[in-house]
Amino acid sequence: MASRPDTDDYLNLFLNDVPLMDVRAPVEFAKGSFPSAENAPLMNDEERHRVGICYKEKGQDKAIELGHQLVSGDIKAQRIEAWKRFVAQHPEGYLFCFRGGLRSRLTQQWIRDSGIDYPLVKGGYKALRRFLIDSLEAQIESGQFRILSGRTGTGKTRVLMQLPNPVDLEGLANHRGSSFGRQVTPQPSQIDFENRLGVAMLKARHQAGGPIYLEDESRLIGRCALPETLRARMSESPLLILEQAMEERIAIIRADYVEGMLASYRARDGEDAGWLNFRDYLLSAIDRIRKRLGGERYQKLRNLMLQALDQQEANGSLEGHHGWIEALLTDYYDPMYDYQLTQKQGEILVRGGPEVITEWARSRTST
């Protein structure tokens, strides 16, 4: 393999999803890494913990000595094999540790001893993260945003992805943004979410260009928090208001939150367990907004939901779900959205259905 130099071209790494081998410990990786990174640690969590204590008590030289003792023999051979597999699968990639220092150099040397030259990222995770955060803040400050808004169930995410330069905040957070919004797979950590957002914004700026379209979101998407600076820009940015008839909204919610979520739970957990977990998902979602609904309204909606679930389990019919969906939209989500819309500072550019919104945006890609 021809030797490649180490790199500090962070923009290229992120724009091109260059594979990255993160040699930090699993606990560090779990707190946050990058979309194109895989964890292939030099030390496991326990080894890192022991070396860290040694460093504090006895200094760097003794810590390095202990590290070599802990990662030796078969353990060392297994780690090197894991790195070699990554290199074979991703010859165009790079490796990194926290600061681009000792762990990166040692990993690089051990791979080189096996006859392979593999470059590292200068400055490591810390430099990559700083580059992303600085780039994101600069783009939030100077970028042009347009916000796709609309009542719950209008299918905003579907329409967003048909617009010229979208960034899907809910996709990045792996959450649909309401009490019913969780997915069967977990959300990313806050740091992972911020890193994903930073990469998505870089691509929107450098690869597509023009105004960036975002879906209207509150501060929290599930447990992932939007940067306050982005929320402030979104609140004053121009709006596109997506409108749909009630029957269409009910159909969209049923497709996404009933049929889609049941299919996802069954794909993950099997037929019977999937049904039970789907049932728990719907009921826990209504339970989470119990206080905001008020006791009487909550009980009415929960009873409608239970009847719909019983009917679906008995004969597969989805018709019963229309009752609680329509009541939830009419009595809870619509009044809340209508109030929030009055608080918006941005100019309303266009109102209408999906075709109106997409045609308006596409006809103005150069403005």
From Swiss-Prot:
Belongs to the SelU family. Monomer. NCBIfam families: PRK11784.1-2 (NF008750), PRK11784.1-3 (NF008751), tRNA_sel_U_synt (TIGR03167). SMART domains: RHOD. Its EC number is 2.9.1.3. SUPFAM superfamilies: Rhodanese/Cell cycle control phosphatase. This is tRNA 2-selenouridine synthase. InterPro entries: Rhodanese-like_dom, Rhodanese-like_dom_sf, SelU. It comes from Marinobacter nauticus (strain ATCC 700491 / DSM 11845 / VT8). PANTHER family: TRNA 2-SELENOURIDINE SYNTHASE. Keywords: Selenium, Transferase. GO terms for molecular function: transferase activity, transferring alkyl or aryl (other than methyl) groups; tRNA 2-selenouridine synthase activity. Residues 14-137 form the Rhodanese domain. The active site is at C97. The lineage of its organism: Bacteria, Pseudomonadati, Pseudomonadota, Gammaproteobacteria, Pseudomonadales. GO terms for biological process: tRNA wobble uridine modification. It catalyses: 5-methylaminomethyl-2-thiouridine(34) in tRNA + selenophosphate + (2E)-geranyl diphosphate + H2O + H(+) = 5-methylaminomethyl-2-selenouridine(34) in tRNA + (2E)-thiogeraniol + phosphate + diphosphate; 5-methylaminomethyl-2-thiouridine(34) in tRNA + (2E)-geranyl diphosphate = 5-methylaminomethyl-S-(2E)-geranyl-thiouridine(34) in tRNA + diphosphate; 5-methylaminomethyl-S-(2E)-geranyl-thiouridine(34) in tRNA + selenophosphate + H(+) = 5-methylaminomethyl-2-(Se-phospho)selenouridine(34) in tRNA + (2E)-thiogeraniol; 5-methylaminomethyl-2-(Se-phospho)selenouridine(34) in tRNA + H2O = 5-methylaminomethyl-2-selenouridine(34) in tRNA + phosphate. Involved in the post-transcriptional modification of the uridine at the wobble position (U34) of tRNA(Lys), tRNA(Glu) and tRNA(Gln). Catalyzes the conversion of 2-thiouridine (S2U-RNA) to 2-selenouridine (Se2U-RNA). Acts in a two-step process involving geranylation of 2-thiouridine (S2U) to S-geranyl-2-thiouridine (geS2U) and subsequent selenation of the latter derivative to 2-selenouridine (Se2U) in the tRNA chain. The gene is selU. Signal peptide: none annotated. It is an enzyme of class 2 (transferase).
